[in-house]
Every structure is written in structure tokens, then in C-alpha cells.
Curated annotation (Swiss-Prot):
Gene: pcyA
Top EC category: oxidoreductase
Function in brief: Catalyzes the four-electron reduction of biliverdin IX-alpha (2-electron reduction at both the A and D rings); the reaction proceeds via an isolatable 2-electron intermediate, 181,182-dihydrobiliverdin.
InterPro entries assigned: Ferredoxin-dep_bilin_Rdtase, Ferredoxin_bilin_OxRdtase
Name under which the protein is recorded: Phycocyanobilin:ferredoxin oxidoreductase
Coiled coil location: none
Top-level taxon in the UniProt lineage: Bacteria
Length: 245
């Protein structure tokens, strides 16, 4: 049974982050056979200082037959920055995309919200099964779309990257993340292990995704300021975007 009780900082975070964390955990529990994933020692809960402000990072990690690692990170910097970060890393013996979701906010507003099912193959395309399921979702209209980073070729055409401007748009974003999760979990459970040759290709695709994500300078700068370069490198490469095998 997955423990979905609030972590100690969740109630202190922006309401959208609180709601989304619950949506993610509840979908994992409903659809997947979960077990705990062991993080490197000392990296499950971390406290530090960033420009005089208290920084707290809390991580939850699980695994399932189809996913080698399912990571949910919640972070808070003083009273001015709340963060949710989530990635579902497939087991390479299943040909599945990468689910990812991030929110950057403060107590009053959300500055960025992104969610995607990103292809993890050499062609950088989703499978026909995923294409069909995602294409049937209703289109959404948001006032403020955000530009993807320069390294953003890993994202799919269904990627949602916005700044929600009101409660209605926040609800639309949560509902779309729930759509992504339901599709992803259901198709993952229905999927079958692949050949050794395809597993090698899946590994390469996942490594490409992780290598691109490690180029996120904003994340690195925050971690280096709070904990130093060596610790930041370790956290990024062993917790946020560890390379399989």
C-alpha cells in the first residue's frame, strides 16, 4: 500500500502543488504495483540555505514492474519559491515514454507548469498507441504559453508548458496531468517486455532524455548556490536524472 499521507512541507506549498502531488500519488497507487525505491543515503530529505532562506527538499521514490524509478520531489525556498518535480523512468525492457511534470510557484501564483509524455526512442516520436490515446483528449486553451528550452527536442507535441492565470486554468492543468497519468499507467500495465535489441535502444533513448534534462542551468544554479557544485552534481545525476545502468 502506498502511503499518501501529506509530507511535512506539502501543506506549506502552493495549493496547485498540493493537489497535483495527490493526483500523482493516487494514480500510482490505483494502477501500479508499487514498492519503495531506495535513494542514495542522505538524499531523501535535505535542508540547506539559499541566499539566507531555508531550503527544504523532500523526495518520494517508488518502483513498479514497468518503471525502474518513479520520483516525486517537493521543495520550498523560504516564502518565495515552491517546486514540484516528477518523473517516471520506464524499465528499459518496456518501450514506454517518460512522464514528466514540474511546477514552479510561490504561495500566491504559479509562474510555470509543464507536463508531458516524452518519447524515449531514437526517432523522438511516441508510439501509435500513445498517439491515438493522446490525440483523443480535448484541446485546451491557455492565455500564456511558455517557450520550451533550447534543449527541448525531447518533448512531444502534446507537451503542455504554461503559466496558469486563474483557478480555471489551474484546474485544466491538473485534469490534463491526470489524463496523462491515466493513459500512461494503463498502457504501461498492458505493455509487454521487449527483445534484448529493443531494450538496448530504449536504454539509449532514456540516456538521451536524462542527458538533455541535466542541461537545465536553472536547477543547477539553485542547487550549487545552496549546497555547492559537488553536491549539486551528485543530486542531479543520482536523484533527478540518473542514467540507467
Amino acid at each position: 500500500m502506498l502511503d499518501t499521507s501529506p509530507v511535512s512541507i506539502r501543506s506549506q506549498l502552493n495549493p496547485l502543488i498540493c493537489q497535483l502531488a495527490e493526483v500523482i500519488l493516487s494514480h500510482w497507487q490505483e494502477y501500479l504495483s508499487l514498492s519503495l525505491y531506495k535513494l542514495p543515503d542522505g538524499l531523501g530529505y535535505v535542508e540547506g540555505k539559499l541566499e539566507g532562506e531555508r531550503l527544504v527538499i523532500e523526495n518520494r521514490c517508488y518502483q513498479a514492474p514497468q518503471f525502474r524509478k518513479m520520483h516525486l520531489e517537493l521543495a520550498k525556498v523560504g516564502k518565495g519559491l515552491d517546486i514540484l518535480h516528477c518523473v517516471m523512468f520506464p524499465n528499459p525492457d518496456y518501450s514506454l515514454p517518460m512522464f514528466g511534470c514540474d511546477i514552479v510557484a510561490n504561495s500566491r501564483a504559479v509562474s510555470a507548469a509543464i507536463a508531458d509524455l516524452s518519447p524515449a526512442n531514437a526517432e523522438l516520436t511516441l508510439s501509435p498507441t500513445y498517439q491515438k490515446a493522446l490525440s483523443q483528449l480535448p484541446s485546451l486553451d491557455f492565455r500564456e504559453s511558455r517557450d520550451l528550452p533550447e534543449w527541448g527536442d525531447i518533448f512531444s507535441e502534446y507537451c503542455l508548458f504554461i503559466r496558469p492565470t486563474n483557478a480555471e486554468e489551474e484546474t485544466q492543468f491538473i485534469n490534463r496531468v491526470a489524463d496523462f497519468l491515466k493513459i500512461h499507467c494503463q498502457l504501461a500495465v498492458q505493455s509487454q517486455p521487449v527483445s534484448v535489441e529493443q531494450e538496448t535502444l530504449n536504454l539509449a533513448g532514456q540516456k538521451y532524455y536524462c542527458t538533455k534534462q541535466q542541461q537545465n542551468d536553472k536547477t543547477r544554479r539553485v542547487l550549487e548556490k545552496a549546497f555547492g557544485q559537488e553536491w549539486a552534481d551528485k543530486y542531479i545525476t543520482q536523484v533527478l536524472f540518473d542514467l540507467p545502468y
